[in-house]
C-alpha cells in the first residue's frame, strides 16, 4: 500500500468513528445509563410510558439511592420519574435526602419554564403540578421526622 492509501484508510476509519460518536450523542437513551433512559422520554407513546416505568422500577430498586443527589435535567422533570420516585421513597429517605428531594421538586418550575424547546406547554404544566404536590408531601415528611 502507498502512503496515500494508509492515510485514506485512516481518514475513513476516523470519520466512521466520529459518526458513531455523534450518533450516540444524538440519542439520549444510548448515551444514558439504563436507569436514566426513561428520564428523557416525555411523550405519551407506549414506548415512552414503558421506558418511564422501567426507569422508575430501577430507581425504586436502587438500595443505595445514589440517584437522589444526581442533578436532573428539564426532561427528567417533565418525565416525572424522579419526582414520582421521591414521592414513593419519602418514608425511606434520610433527612438530608428529603431536604435534597424537596429542593429538587421546588426547582422543577423554573427548570421547566426555562427549558429550551422540546417540551410542550402541557408537559411543562404537568411537571410543575406534580413537583408542587410532591414538594408539599416531602415538606410534611421532613417536618414530621426531621425537626431540629
Where are the regions a protein language model picked out?
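C-terminal motif of bacterial Sec signal peptides marking the signal peptidase cleavage site
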Residues: 21-24
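Bacterial N-terminal signal peptides that target proteins for export
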Residues: 2-15
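Extended, charge-rich alpha-helical interface modules
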Residues: 5, 26-148
Amino acid at each position: 500500500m502507498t502512503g496515500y492509501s494508509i492515510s485514506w484508510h485512516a481518514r475513513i476509519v476516523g470519520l466512521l468513528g466520529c459518526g458513531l460518536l455523534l450518533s450516540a450523542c444524538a440519542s439520549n437513551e444510548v448515551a444514558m445509563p439504563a436507569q436514566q433512559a426513561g428520564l428523557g422520554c416525555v411523550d405519551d407513546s407506549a414506548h415512552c410510558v414503558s421506558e418511564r416505568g422501567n426507569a422508575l422500577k430501577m430507581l425504586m430498586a436502587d438500595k443505595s439511592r445514589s440517584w437522589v443527589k444526581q442533578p436532573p435535567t428539564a426532561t427528567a422533570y417533565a418525565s416525572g420519574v424522579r419526582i414520582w420516585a421521591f414521592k414513593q421513597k419519602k418514608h425511606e429517605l434520610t433527612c438530608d435526602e428529603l431536604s435534597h428531594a424537596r429542593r429538587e421538586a421546588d426547582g422543577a418550575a423554573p427548570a421547566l419554564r426555562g427549558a429550551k424547546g422540546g417540551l410542550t406547554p402541557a408537559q411543562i404544566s404537568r411537571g410543575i403540578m406534580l413537583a408542587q404536590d410532591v414538594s408539599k408531601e416531602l415538606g410534611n415528611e421532613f417536618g414530621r421526622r426531621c425537626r431540629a
